[in-house]
Amino acid sequence: MVKHSEYFVEPRPNGTWEVKLPHAERASAVVDTQSEAIQTARQFAPEGVIHVKQLNGKFRRIG
């Protein structure tokens, strides 16, 4: 299994949050809250970097 070191957490129009690889068209996971999305991304990439897109459109980096 390939391990990735970078994931993006972004809000969806319906209010849920998605966890995606950079440049991916489809989400790796969809969850109800930003907190859950960050936890999921951390499970996918324990030592990786997570970029969280905030509701204002700016990104913040975790890890």
Question: Which residues are covered by each model-predicted region?
Answer:
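A short, charged, amphipathic alpha-helix used as a generic interaction element across diverse proteins
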Residues: 31-47
